[in-house]
């Protein structure tokens, strides 16, 4: 699989207070394509960020029900991947920011 396909697989990193705390344990969270499997997520992270992945956990996140101006709707369903890296590897999302 070429590297541009991997960029379609990984939607975006999840940067919240909770994911910042687990990043100290070498775990990082990403929203991924809803058809993504553990093995393809592992290959994509290794190819894009040039790191060694130890383990991948996948979660299906059901969309919440929201009401806006009296109209009830639902947010989209998403798939989340928690990626554990080997000890000597890490990902720096804010590398070029000064």
Curated annotation (Swiss-Prot):
Which residues are listed as membrane-spanning? Answer: none
Its quaternary structure?
Part of the 50S ribosomal subunit. Contacts protein L29, and trigger factor when it is bound to the ribosome.
Q: Which UniProt keywords apply?
A: Ribonucleoprotein, Ribosomal protein, RNA-binding, rRNA-binding
Q: Which biological process terms from the Gene Ontology are attached to this UniProt entry?
A: translation
* Family of this protein: Belongs to the universal ribosomal protein uL23 family.
The record ties this protein, via HAMAP family, to: Ribosomal_uL23_B (MF_01369_B)
Q: What is the lineage of its organism?
A: Bacteria, Pseudomonadati, Pseudomonadota, Alphaproteobacteria, Rickettsiales
**What GO CC terms are in its UniProt record?**
ribonucleoprotein complex; ribosome
Briefly, what is this protein's role? One of the early assembly proteins it binds 23S rRNA. One of the proteins that surrounds the polypeptide exit tunnel on the outside of the ribosome. Forms the main docking site for trigger factor binding to the ribosome.
| GO terms for MF | rRNA binding; structural constituent of ribosome
Concerning Pfam families, the annotation shows:
Ribosomal_L23
Q: Please report the name of this protein according to its UniProt entry.
A: Large ribosomal subunit protein uL23
């Amino acid at each position: 699989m070429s590297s541009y396909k991997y960029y379609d697989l990984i939607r975006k990193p999840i940067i919240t207070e909770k994911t910042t705390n687990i990043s100290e344990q070498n775990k990082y969270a990403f929203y991924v394509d809803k058809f993504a499997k553990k093995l393809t997520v592992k290959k994509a992270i290794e190819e894009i960020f040039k790191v060694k992945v130890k383990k991948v956990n996948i979660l299906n996140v059901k969309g919440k029900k929201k009401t806006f101006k009296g109209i009830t709707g639902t947010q989209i369903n998403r798939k989340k991947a928690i990626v554990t890296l080997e000890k000597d590897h890490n990902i720096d999302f804010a590398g070029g920011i000064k």
